[in-house]
Structure formats: C-alpha cells, structure tokens
Amino acid sequence: MSLELNTIKVNPTGWGPVGKLEKFTDIPYAPFSKGDKIGKCSDWNSNVRNYQRQNYGSNAFNPFTFKLEDDEDSFTLVDYTRVQNKLKNKGKTYQKQFYQQNKRGGSNAGGRGGRGGMRGGRFGSNNKYWNDRRQRNRESSIEILSSWESKEEFDLSTFKQYTVEQLPEPETIGTYGQVKYYNKVYDRINAKNEKKLQKTENSVPLIPTSDDKVIRSEYMNGNVYATDSILAVLMSAQKSVYSWDIVVQKVGARLFFELRPGTSEHLTVNENLTAHHQDDKDPINTTSSLSQEATQVNLNYWQQVLSQNVEPFKFDNELPEGDEFENCVDVGYAYKKWDLGDDIVVLARTEIDGVVEGLPGQPPKFISIKAINEHDSNRFGIEFRKKLDSQRAAILATEIKNNSTKFAKWSIQSTLAGCEMLNLGFVSRDSIRDNNNHVILGTQFYPVADLNKQNGVDMKNCWGILKHIAQTCMKLANGKYLLHRDPNRNVINLYSVPENAFDQIEEETQEEEEEEQSKGWVEESRE
C-alpha cells in the first residue's frame, strides 16, 4: 500500500504559503481582530446607556456586525405555558397587584416609579425607543428625475466662509396694504390664566415672485427677485436638515427665485433635534402632521393677538386688486432693495405682521408675530404649563436648539422687513392627543438682534451665502432651474429642468394668453 501526499507548495524566498487556492477565490478579505465582538448577543439586564455604547470592536462599518434587515414589529412570542388550577386565585391577585403598581409608575408611565415596575423617570416615555436603531432616511421634497441635468453642487459645510464686508443698506421702494395693532391684553396671559386659541377661516395670500405686480412695475430696481421667506430659506440653508426646493428662472441678466407651483410654505417642528423626533406610528405626530399643525397654529395666533376694534395702520399704497387677496388676512408689504456689489442687486417683498404704538412723539413700530407650539413635552423639552412662568428663558433656549432653522428664518425675515421686535407666543395642545384644539399659555416680546445672536445668525454671512448662490446662477444659460436641498446629504444640488416643468394645466386658455401678454416686461429684459 502506498501513501499519496498532496501537492505541497514551497516558498523559497520567504515564510508563508504561495499562490492562491480556487476554493478561497470568491471569499472577500476583511481585516478583523480576535478581540472584536462578532455582533452582540442578547443581554436583557443591560440598560439603554450600555446598549448605545460600543466600547471596542465591531461597529456599523464592520462586516461581521449583525444588522437588522427586516422590521420585527410584527414578531410576537406565543405563551403556551399551562396555568395550574391550584394557583388560579393567587394568580388573579398577583395580576391585579401588578396592574395597580404599573399604573402608578410602570415601564411606560414616565412618572414616579412604582414598586412593581421600572423607574419611570429613566425608562418612562422613551423606553419604547431603546431598541429602535433603524436608520431613518428623510423624504425628498420632490422626486428628482433622471432627465434633469445637474449643474452645480453646493457644499453646505463651506457656507460659513461666505460673507460680505459691510451689511447692505436697505432702500424701501414702496409699502402696500395695512396691518392691525397688537392687543396688549395678551401680555397678561400666563400658564395659570391660559386662553383658548381661536381658529381663523382666512388664509395668507400666496403670490409667486414672477406674478407680483409691484415687482413687475419696479423690476428695473434690481436683477435678483424673491420674497423674504425665500431669501430666509437660502440664507439659513446651512442650518437646514429637511429637504426643500426653490425654482430659479434665469431670464437674461435677471434671476427669479420662487416656490414651486402648487406648494406653500410650511413650518417645521424639531427639525434640528438629533433624537427620535418623528413618530411614524402615531398619525398626529408625524413630520408632515406636526408641520401642518405648527403652520395653522401660527396663523391662528397671529390673527388672535391683533386688535379687531382698532383702526388698522395703513401704508402708503393699497394692495393691487386681484383674486389672490380674497378671503385673506390683512397684510402689509414693504418692497426693498439691497445692493450686494458685483452687479448683484436684490429686490424683495417683505412682510410685516403687526404694529405697536411707539413712545409719545414717536411713530409706531412694526413687529413680527410668531408662535411655538408644544405637542409632547415628555420627549422634546420642558413642559410649558409647569415651567413657563418660572423658566421661560430655559424653554426658549430649548426651542431654539431643537428648531434652530425655523428661528433663523423668523429672525432673518424680521430683519429684512425692518422689524426690531418679534412677539413670540407659547401655545400648547389642549390635550396631548388632540392636535386640533390649543391654548395660549404666554406671550413675550424679544429683540430680533438678540434672537440672531443667540441662534448664531450672522447677517453678513447670510448675505454672503445669497450672493454666492446668485453669482453661480448668473453664469447659467437662460432657462428654468431647481435648487434642491438633498434630504440625506449636506449639499444643495442645482438642476436644469425643462421649461414646462412644474407648470399647472389650466383649462381657460384666455387667461394664459393674457398672462403671456402681461409678462412683456420679462421679454424686454432679455435684450
């Protein structure tokens, strides 16, 4: 009998094997250490802090780490144990005691911990999220088509470097409309003397930039046209987290920034909160539901705190006649222009919310009126009803931290409109499960300059960002473009879109022909 030996490869130049084995060809090589943890076993005694911490070893980038691919919410365990008859009465007594103890301070109570449950303060309302490590991809504000050509990509992390040497001086072109006076009765409202928030049936007029009759008549005063809300979106872009988009029209040496047709301005809620700030399983606390609620609360609060029996303050000119002002609230518009240098002159429509009486011998002062609404204080901040009267500064700091983008837009819009004061209302739900009824718990006036400083808003940097975007768009050919804030990357993409993109189909061709004739001033600017 003979012994057959396998082929042995010899390495004459060093130690170790040579060549490759075919059975190992398709196995990828991944470096690892024997001290690394291969995934993580179940540890029911660990707490939330230990679960979130990875002291060493594998992490999300290690190929050996176990990853949850499917949603296990539908997975349940079936209890097949048999209940013994002799423990029947004793079991009922124990279950009754356990229920009563959990009702006092169980795992989801979030209050004073009961004897039979976990400590409420630590594992209260957030305990249902301790095992929720799913990556949440934010939704895009619009579907990006493959046929759109990418022209530019703005890195938001570099926006801090753009600035202007001096703040541009605003020049008022004209003022239109009327605004009502602030009712000082609401200064006496506090958490113990709350007032129900009333609902208004009127809406805010939505006038696209290119359809604004005043901008049409005064278009020679600038070459970049927008509204204060659109300018605020661009100026606060580096703080934004959620996706947004703005349409850009390049006509000759002029730029028009406006909202996409069919869309309206909505406020965000807890946009800058890094924790679990959206609950997809709760229909009233989703991102879209909270946004609609905050937008309606702001409109209702704005109209309620204005005096209805006092003659409103009228500006120099009346609003142009048009259907867009029917069933709308009283608004005041101030059209202003800013010269940023390098042939960039901005002409914008700014909005004024209200007016307060000045000191004796002084003219009235224009103000902005906004509101923050509380929907779940156990998860997102300090409870308004308990701490508003004693810790109002702490509540404001928490709200600015969680809503830095929204506060930046508000203060920028107020600065552009020339409003030195902002009236902020503190509104809460009448019931935590009711997003339709709210109460006013307090009001406070804040200097706009202080809000800018507290939120880290530098107007020189804001104007520098706008100038950089405008100069980039000025280099483009005539056409329609879209500025899109990527939902999951810290960039803004500039796409070239067809001329008929986003156009709404209208049945009445007569109105379309009149619209084309009235835009002759745009064609003139092409020359």
Swiss-Prot record:
Residues 100-136, 503-527 are annotated as: Disordered. Residues 504-516 have a biased composition (Acidic residues). GO terms for cellular component: centrosome; eukaryotic 43S preinitiation complex; eukaryotic 48S preinitiation complex; eukaryotic translation initiation factor 3 complex; phagocytic vesicle. The keyword Cytoplasm applies. Keywords: Cytoplasm, Initiation factor, Protein biosynthesis, RNA-binding. One of its GO terms (biological process) is response to bacterium. Residues 107-123 have a biased composition (Gly residues). GO terms for molecular function: mRNA cap binding; translation initiation factor activity. It is found in: Cytoplasm. Residues 517-527 have a biased composition (Basic and acidic residues). InterPro entries: eIF3d. Component of the eukaryotic translation initiation factor 3 (eIF-3) complex. mRNA cap-binding component of the eukaryotic translation initiation factor 3 (eIF-3) complex, which is involved in protein synthesis of a specialized repertoire of mRNAs and, together with other initiation factors, stimulates binding of mRNA and methionyl-tRNAi to the 40S ribosome. The eIF-3 complex specifically targets and initiates translation of a subset of mRNAs involved in cell proliferation. In the eIF-3 complex, eif3d specifically recognizes and binds the 7-methylguanosine cap of a subset of mRNAs. PANTHER family: EUKARYOTIC TRANSLATION INITIATION FACTOR 3 SUBUNIT 7, EUKARYOTIC TRANSLATION INITIATION FACTOR 3 SUBUNIT D. This is Eukaryotic translation initiation factor 3 subunit D. It comes from Dictyostelium discoideum (Social amoeba).
